[in-house]
Amino acid sequence: MKIKNAQLTKAAGLDKLKQKLAQAGSSDTKSSSEKPTTKVPEKVAKEKVVKKKSVLDSSVPTMAEHVSTETSPRRIRAKNRSSFASEDSTIPSPVSVDTESTAFSPPVVEEVVSPLESAEPEIVEPTPASIVDEPETTIQEPPPPKKEAELVVKKEPPKNVVSIKSNFGPTGKHINHLLAKTFKAPKKEDKPAPKERTGTVQTKPQQSSEVPSDKQHSSNNRQSQPFYRRDTSKRPGSDFRDRSKKDDSPKAFTGRDRYGLNDSSDDDKWRKKRVQKTKKHYDEHSVQRPTHIKVPLPITIKDLAAEMKLKASELIQKMFIHGMTYVVNDVLDNETTVQFIGLEFGCTIDIDSSEQDKLCIESNTVKEEIQETDPSQLIIRPPIVAFMGHVDHGKTTLIDSLRKSNVAAVEAGAITQHMGAFCCSTPVGNITILDTPGHEAFSAMRARGAEVCDIVVLVVAGDEGIKEQTLEAVKHARAANITIVVAINKCDKPNFNADTVYRQLSEINLLPEAWGGTTVTINTSAKTGEGLSELLEMLALQAEVLELKANPEARARGIVIESELHKGLGAVATILVQNGTLHLGEALVFNDCYGKVKTMHNEHNQLMTSASPSVPALITGLSSMPKAGDPFVVVKNEKTAKEIVNARIAGQQKFALQKKRPNFDAMLQNKKILKLIIKADVQGSIEALSSSVLKIVSDKVSAEILSSSVGEISESDIRLAAASKAVIIGFHTGIESHAESLIKNLGVKVHLFNIIYHAVDAVKEMMTALLDPIAEERNLGSAEIKETFKSSQLGTIYGCLVSEGVMTRNQKVRVVRNNEVLWKGNLSSLKRIKEDVKEVKKGLECGILLEGYQNAQVGDILQCYEVIYHPQKL
């Protein structure tokens, strides 16, 4: 092979080497014609490099291997390809081994395809390579002089070159790395410089012969130092020979490994560091807190703190210092409390009532509205009279006599349990009468009746006098500032005594006219009709004095007397118009429901087209059932009514989700709770029954009402009772037909009542049944142990003498020693002269076997007793 680069020859001073190479080239040409084209074995190339080095440095002794050219040497396949290829790409000639010790082999030149297609020769710098071991001897040569040499390299890759098997795949990675994770190319801006393509298979740094492993050093004793071309166009450290060995220690599994973004053979420099979020530090003094704000009521602690630019914890801490315990979601509805909190932080708080003004369609009361009306538009309206008094004092019978009807016969138990509103005609004019219940459970109804009516007729039985509910009715009437007329009823009875009633009235500051006072008193009899005409005249006189007037042309306003759920009509309500006139088809707004009047009936179930002031009516067409006592007002249309009600409900639901605080006192006391579900025919009955149940106070058990609604007992009520283990109380209602079978299947307790005090008594009995009975120990007798006997089968048998009472089998026994109870248990066996007996009387001896106790001694006392359980009281 001819070396065309003259500069390399002159720089290295290889004149003699040039001659040797020329001779070797001629011998190679001859042998190439005889032998097939093969690649030069790497081992032979390494030997030639060693011989070349021996010529350069004669001071180092070399030992060449004498191999004859006649006998062809055994070809050794190289583990890695050489760094240089022969210049002739078509017919590469094999190099023969020189027999002389000073023979040299030319360096193998690797044909490299340059990325720049230029015709100029490329300068290659020869550098010392790693040494390859030979089995015979190991020769170390000093590095050649570091002068650049220029070699001419052909661009055409060699043909018919035997490929060398490698442990690396076409991707350039070891199979272990490919199995571990997939490779994902880096971003364009971070891609490393592309490697130059070579005509032969690329040599990998991990398995390169230039960097031999420890196993290679042990197997091979000779070293070779092939030259390789350094590309100066690449950045420093980009070549695989310049890289240091990476740390093969296992790395932690990260999120990038899951998507194949990490690879052990890749450079980590291209990866971008994750930008860590730095915490923003706020300066408390930099926040400008307002000095004047406007908030609506009610408002939560969280919202108030946001308006004041404060933390909720600061508000809670300040309120706790002043004795107010709140959490972040608690609601503040007191204007004074909100303003006090603002002053503590130097902020003036005003209450914003704009939203409430939109929802409040009535700005004043009915009386104020009438007073502001032009007197020319007012007319005289009938008086509204409420009959109030104690139960069974004859209120309903007296009203029946005035109306000439028989309502009392319809009431269950002959007591009024509903509020009735009637409009009756009398010789003195029309009167609207409200019949309120006299039972103690209907206190809310009596209070509503006192608020609505103009005159209160206090019915007192002449034979019984003033009772508890009578005093309560007086209290309600005085609170509403209503005129009171006393009707002393049952004057036809022989034990009637009006003076006793007068004395009792004077004691409560109702001095009768007969005694010189101002309170009107009339003796009446519902059965004989005595005093009824006088009562009507007195009511008409009081109405003239009060000057009761109303404006029939105004929009209708009034109050709900009673409401119920009808099977065919749905939600119905008994209303009383206080001002204006209610017509069919008008839209109404109640507190939390609305409706459009579809039908209107009077007390005789006759259709009505309008209801004037002081006239009661039964209306239908409501969205839901209003509560008794709710006011109503007529609005423009049903759409407006719906918007107002929805806005009110949304405001209520905003704070309805607030969790109830647990009753820690009840938890500490470990109270038992009776859960109830109440169903009734009307809303007033629910209020009465609920208030009566909640009035049952006990330190050991309490009643809790889970649900209360109007209507029949349905499947949903039964399922709720089964899930919560509650008892259903039905008052003046029934059970749906398809729900009766469900009651038996789920085992739910259902109690139906028509009289309210029967329902209250039943609830008391159920609450008492929840209490654990009190255990009482009653002594039956005692016996002294005189002797003990050991039995292998039964244990210890005690021979006793009954000293007091009777010892009975299958009773409880106490073992007493020195007035101290050692054990309590059952007496399992009792014998008298080897015979089982039920009892042994005083003065007799017996054998006793205790169940589970063998440690009694002679002289101990066995006390026989029985346990008696007594029910607790509320």
Curated annotation (Swiss-Prot):
**The keyword Ubl conjugation belongs to this UniProt entry's keyword annotation:** no
**Key words of the record:** Cytoplasm, GTP-binding, Initiation factor, Nucleotide-binding, Protein biosynthesis
Residue ranges for the region (G1) are 389-396
Q: Where is this region: G5?
A: 525-527
> Which InterPro entries did the record assign?
EF-G-like_DII, EFTu-like_2, IF2_II, IF2_N, P-loop_NTPase, Small_GTP-bd, T_Tr_GTP-bd_dom, TF_IF2_bacterial-like
Positions of the tr-type G domain: 380-549
Compositionally biased spans, kind Low complexity: 105-118
Look up keyword Cytoplasm and say if it applies: yes
Its domain of life?
A: Bacteria
Q: Where in the cell is it found?
A: Cytoplasm
Ranges of compositional bias, category Basic and acidic residues: 31-48, 144-158, 186-198, 228-260
Region entry G4, spans: 489-492
Q: Where GTP is bound, by residue?
A: 389-396, 435-439, 489-492
* Region G2, annotated ranges: 414-418
- Spans of biased composition, class Polar residues? 81-104, 199-211
Q: Which GO terms describe its cellular component?
A: cytosol
Q: Where is this region: Disordered?
A: 1-289
Where in this protein does the record put region G3? Answer: 435-438
Q: Where is the composition biased (Basic residues)?
A: 271-280
Picking any one GO molecular function of the record gives:
GTP binding
The task this protein performs is described as: One of the essential components for the initiation of protein synthesis. Protects formylmethionyl-tRNA from spontaneous hydrolysis and promotes its binding to the 30S ribosomal subunits. Also involved in the hydrolysis of GTP during the formation of the 70S ribosomal complex.
Q: Which family does it belong to?
A: Belongs to the TRAFAC class translation factor GTPase superfamily. Classic translation factor GTPase family. IF-2 subfamily.
Record protein name field: Translation initiation factor IF-2
Query: What is the taxonomic lineage of the source species?
Result: Bacteria, Pseudomonadati, Chlamydiota, Chlamydiia, Chlamydiales
